[in-house]
Amino acid sequence: MNQPVSASPVVSVGSVTFGQDRPLSIIAGPCQMESRAHALEVAGALKDIAARLNVGLVFKTSFDKANRTSASGARGIGLKQALPVFADIRSSLGLPVLTDVHEAAQCAEVAQVVDVLQIPAFLCRQTDLLLAAAATGKVVNVKKGQFLAPWDMGNVVAKITGGGNRNILVTERGASFGYNTLVSDMRALPILARTTGAPVIFDATHSVQQPGGKGASTGGEREFVPVLARAAVAVGVAGVFIETHPDPDHAPSDGPNMVPLREFEALVRRLMAFDALAKAADPACPE
């Protein structure tokens, strides 16, 4: 069995900390980078919300949605256009930034302007990609593949630590259940924490996806995002990943499972209350 990263890990992303016994932190932003103006608008709104709630927040968005259902699906503004936008968000807003990488050759360049490199779920076993991300020294957030058991992620994390990087987050985003459906097994959250030794993130929006559910695009059931997010926080996680958009019904990707930006603050406020209760010390209720 692979050795976990540590018994009680804390991973810092700028001023934001992720730990199983630390207050909840949030990773949030639109599915894809649609334009510089759109990214800065959403990032600015999220920064204001995080300040009001006093919650740690990492901004996320993707420069390329390489894994689209259809070849005609919008993919984002692309790597070269996105790099200066990532830099602007970090410098002008002071927010740490996360984005996903799809090829080993992208890692070093992207790492110059972001704080977290994310490994997509479908690529979580790609050894060259994991090693290239590890070599940057940046925090690596690796999503558990929909096809993997939670205990299988020990081998994935071992590849990253074997590459000399112990700054790792592990994200649960559901498991394939028949056709066009994902389910969230809440047992996976403590199993991931125990097996990998890394702080665990729950991806509340991708967990309600219906992959390929609309034929040429992915469907989703965003009404269940708060339900699953509350359940995960009650079980105990280091953070929650939430994709949000000012107008998700007209977003170029993942609209059916994104949370409307106007609903984001109330959702996070409630999750913080659940988190405080879940992590409160109570000697009468041992784990």
UniProtKB/Swiss-Prot annotation:
Highest taxon of source: Bacteria
Keyword field: Cytoplasm, Lipopolysaccharide biosynthesis, Transferase
UniProt subcellular location: Cytoplasm
Main location, first listed in the record: cytoplasm
Biological process (GO), any one: keto-3-deoxy-D-manno-octulosonic acid biosynthetic process
Entry GO terms, CC: cytoplasm
Biological pathway: Carbohydrate biosynthesis; 3-deoxy-D-manno-octulosonate biosynthesis; 3-deoxy-D-manno-octulosonate from D-ribulose 5-phosphate: step 2/3; Bacterial outer membrane biogenesis; lipopolysaccharide biosynthesis
Alphabetical list of Gene3D superfamilies matching this protein: Aldolase class I (3.20.20.70)
GO molecular function term, any single one: 3-deoxy-8-phosphooctulonate synthase activity
Disulfide bonds: none
A Pfam family assignment: DAHP_synth_1
E.C. no: 2.5.1.55
SUPFAM superfamilies according to UniProt: Aldolase (SSF51569)
Reaction catalyzed: D-arabinose 5-phosphate + phosphoenolpyruvate + H2O = 3-deoxy-alpha-D-manno-2-octulosonate-8-phosphate + phosphate
Similarity comment: Belongs to the KdsA family.
HAMAP family: KDO8P_synth
Protein name: 2-dehydro-3-deoxyphosphooctonate aldolase
Protein's gene: kdsA
